Amino acid sequence: MSEAEARPTNFIRQIIDEDLASGKHTTVHTRFPPEPNGYLHIGHAKSICLNFGIAQDYQGQCNLRFDDTNPVKEDIEYVDSIKNDVEWLGFHWSGDIRYSSDYFDQLHAYAVELINKGLAYVDELTPEQIREYRGTLTAPGKNSPFRDRSVEENLALFEKMRTGGFEEGKACLRAKIDMASPFIVMRDPVLYRIKFAEHHQTGTKWCIYPMYDFTHCISDALEGITHSLCTLEFQDNRRLYDWVLDNITIPVHPRQYEFSRLNLEYTVMSKRKLNLLVTDKHVEGWDDPRMPTISGLRRRGYTAASIREFCKRIGVTKQDNTIEMASLESCIREDLNENAPRAMAVIDPVKLVIENYPQGESEMVTMPNHPNKPEMGSREVPFSGEIWIDRADFREEANKQYKRLVMGKEVRLRNAYVIKAERVEKDAEGNITTIFCTYDADTLSKDPADGRKVKGVIHWVSVAHALPIEIRLYDRLFSVPNPGAAEDFLSVINPESLVIKQGYGEPSLKAAVAGKAFQFEREGYFCLDSRYATADKLVFNRTVGLRDTWAKAGE
């Protein structure tokens, strides 16, 4: 397959191809412009992959620009996390990082130009009055009583705003467009508002800050962006984007194109709702492995490659839709099935004693790190007469469909011996505390000599060599596919979204590092937690199960 054939095809790429073929543009220049007021989520990953991916494929450029026009909500912590997320996903921005605040002087000059042209005015209506005057979808707005001020008066009042002569909320600069427009965004939108707050880049130089719709288009033009890609909620804003650029003296006029945002089942993408989950401590932070944030997915064990593949599979369209969580999970499952080394861990342990195994002795059994990749090598795992197995892998009685250990019957221990359950010990409540077995000493990694068939295989960990591990079984944060539609989205949080177990792992897990996944054989894919794991306490997060159990539950 050629490079061109391997590229994804979508309507945005078709537009770019046409622009290049017609000579409208000779290069492609995109940008990713997040506001640094929170952590990026999987929806932002779609935009990152689109903007940076297009720049890569067309040998163009993609800027990382922080839309930092609201100092009250923004923080350098978010700037750093966003930079880290973009790099972790495998992308690199062109040149230096940009900030909308880099252009505050130019933005102010363009605002003055609009005033001089009679296209902007200082309004002293309150924010509540501005909303009231704006009208509704079915009723036109009405003009502010301050709309017809002279150019000279507006210039003087705008300067008064800039120098701190008004209190917050007492004045703003508005575009003079059309209060009867069928598009509410065009009903004299606010261009500048007053905020007496220190800015993380400009300090206290400014007390007036430009609005997104005024800043965004001018920043695109100043940077020479050829294709400004936004999600569909900004479709109506394109009219204002074009109006601003049409009415100022600027040589470049980028075009805005909209695509559908990513909606994912069993989670929320609203920054307000995500913030509420964090501040009300329903989760442990923005990087909680149940969160849809990139940092949360990374901590859970998702790889950058799996997220890029997910974004590639869902594609880019203008049609809003909701993606099944199973689609995201299948991407990480396929990635880790192919690349994760195997290990054995017992999540719900019960002791098994092999009564005829030499007492006090142990041996090493060789296990492949990956059943289909001999190049990944093998490891030596200690085996002894006392092992941990998973409680679910033993039954005193079972039907023929149960292929694990049953009283009086045989099963194979993974890469070790065939054993037979002989008896059990129980506590006062009737819970099994120990399973006693015998083993066939001539079956180490081979079939019994007499030809009898042993169908089941279970995993195990030697008691004498086991590493105590904490296992965090993460699941979907919400119990319904569309929590955002619930009257109270907090009421549908999945109470089983985190279950903590104390188990045992094989000794090789001592070398585990955060972010590197294992397949715990027969259990799922897990990675060492980056927050809670220490040298003395191993904590593993479940990234995803071996199979999509939610799909089965819904059938």
Curated annotation (Swiss-Prot):
Superkingdom as given in the UniProt entry: Bacteria
Gene: glnS
Disulfide bonds: none
Binding residues for ATP: 35-37, 41-47, 231, 261-262, 269-271
EC number of the protein: 6.1.1.18
Subunit structure: Monomer.
Family the entry assigns: Belongs to the class-I aminoacyl-tRNA synthetase family.
Tagged with keyword Aminoacyl-tRNA synthetase: yes
Protein name: Glutamine--tRNA ligase
One annotated GO molecular function: glutamine-tRNA ligase activity
Entry's localization field: Cytoplasm
Gene Ontology terms: biological process: glutaminyl-tRNA aminoacylation; glutamyl-tRNA aminoacylation
Keywords: Aminoacyl-tRNA synthetase, ATP-binding, Cytoplasm, Ligase, Nucleotide-binding, Protein biosynthesis
HAMAP family: Gln_tRNA_synth
Record field: catalytic activity: tRNA(Gln) + L-glutamine + ATP = L-glutaminyl-tRNA(Gln) + AMP + diphosphate
Lineage: Bacteria, Pseudomonadati, Pseudomonadota, Gammaproteobacteria, Enterobacterales
Primary localization: cytoplasm
GO cellular component terms listed in the entry, alphabetical order: cytosol
Extent of motif 'HIGH' region: 34-44
